């Protein structure tokens, strides 16, 4: 008998615990950019990285959102979780801590209270590389100022997808102002 599995695949690959409410919030935000149907099935999933905390990434080959969550990580690792299925399961769990364990052959155990689910994940190596966006100087401004900027311009944004260029707001940043 020949085993094609590597030793790493047979071991525990990731384990973390976090609050259900934080996990739901992260899935709601990162899930906004997950592709619903794609010729590249891995982008229908959420890239889940557990290191110091938990990082959830959704990407549709145009837009990416990464959401960081406080989590107790006992075993660092990463995998791709099926976004819709994982989100549906987490939303139905009881309130409190949720423990996710990714083990042998990317079998995922999700536990909270008396509830327990098992699903399959995929290797994070299959996830497309995200574009580098750290090319400029970061801009910091209070949340209320950003909200006022958006509120003052959002009325002019088109909802018609026929001309995607009109469905966004352009920010121009100079040394001392944002317009």
Predicted regions: what is each one?
Residues 1-179:
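Structural preference for solvent-exposed beta-strand-turn elements
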